[in-house]
């Protein structure tokens, strides 16, 4: 999906909030603050006029209109109406926010509900065709690199392990220097799968730029559709995640990224399911060999 296609693909219902969060990336601090206020449950319950919103946020009415248009709406009323529909349709799956003094049972229930909400919102805007196009190129590629930093690198290691089970070899690199060395050797017909929540990590961006320059295709899993790394990508798989107290945004992002990559993995496996099953039996037998009691 191109940047222009994303900008025009305004979703309805539960998919609206994650779409707006992704559009929020790259906005100024004041613009972003307006989006956060609008997305907070309860703030639009009394159908406030644009004047009321401007006063509540200490900004001009013109700024509210500007943000509405940046989000893809003709004006504030149109945006407010869409958000009212969103909150009406999603009230059953929107958990109340975590508090610092909650009872243990409430904490556990809310964490589960936040995860469920993240998965449902991600599913509502997922581009299935983009996943299948990316999966086909990944499967056919000569060399497959996996790039990510911090927690995203741990996800890349999981992806490498998952694909090795079905005989699709790919390599995750834990060090930025090794990542760059590998990128320098890539060529046309190769692919990089990059996992980056922000889409702005400098080390990862440098490796992706080099891989792109050398002719490799880029598949990007990211929350930020308009980020520098996403703009380098040939295939973008959106991973929107809400930010919550205590958990932040990374916890929700990790769960959704793993789910999207599971879908990506199955899409790749389906391209040659017979061979995938044969290879799973082989690799599974080796793992079983090292299980307790197997060496007796």
UniProtKB/Swiss-Prot annotation:
InterPro entries linked to this entry: Homeodomain-like_sf, HTH_RpiR, RpiR-like, RpiR-like_SIS, SIS_dom, SIS_dom_sf, WH-like_DNA-bd_sf
User: Which molecular function terms from Gene Ontology are attached?
Assistant: carbohydrate derivative binding; DNA binding; DNA-binding transcription factor activity
Is DNA-binding found in the keyword set? yes
- An example of a Pfam family matching this protein is HTH_6
Q: Could you tell me the keywords of this UniProt record?
A: DNA-binding, Repressor, Transcription, Transcription regulation
Q: Where would I find the SIS domain in this sequence? A: 134-274
The record places domain HTH rpiR-type at 14-90
- Which sequence positions fall in the DNA-binding region? 50-69
Sorted alphabetically, the Gene Ontology BP terms of this entry are: carbohydrate derivative metabolic process; negative regulation of DNA-templated transcription; regulation of DNA-templated transcription
What does the protein in this record do? Regulatory protein involved in rpiB gene repression. Also involved in als operon repression.
According to UniProt, the name of this protein is HTH-type transcriptional regulator RpiR
Q: Which organism is it from?
A: Escherichia coli (strain K12)
What is the taxonomic lineage of the source species?
Bacteria, Pseudomonadati, Pseudomonadota, Gammaproteobacteria, Enterobacterales
- The gene coding this protein: rpiR
